[in-house]
Amino acid sequence: MKTLRLHCGAICALAIFATGCAQLKAPPYAADYEALDRLHASKPGTVAVATTQPTDPTQAVNKLSLRGAALLSPSGSFAKYFEDALIRDLKEVSSFDSSAATRLDSRILKNEISVGGFVTGTGVMEVELTVTRNAQQRLHKIYQVNTTFDSSFAGIVAIPAGQAAYPDLVRTMLRAIYSDPLFIAAVGK
């Protein structure tokens, strides 16, 4: 009987240890087509996208943890994930051109997913965005968005919920940027 308890205890400890150290990948980004339709209707000019900063994968914004489980970007860093999403959206509305005179520079200042709540998880993203045309600054602004999603005290529910919520955090940020009249004016023809 003692041996059985010892084996059960060891198995439980191993299961807890294994899930706490698991590495999860953020799901692929999916565009908000309503936001893209509105952006397309505003008739933006062509835009080049600079490398989103910080590129260092050891920077805090590129390292997310969901109750000890590392959330990794399929792009290598969350800055690259954001950059890829931005380029994909601009291509979708036929506004991306890597040699355009209008250029977007972005820096992620805050990037967090929290699954610590009992029933609700949260996401926070803050991005510094600069738009220049022919080396003249047209926009410099910091955007911040907050998201919430259903979660649970139980890690088996909360961790996958946090993982699934990351693309929505990026989508919410890009929606906020695309709907800003100052951004629309800065990238306009």
Describe each model-derived feature in a short phrase.
Residues 87, 91-95, 113, 174-182:
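Sec-exported extracytoplasmic/periplasmic mature domains
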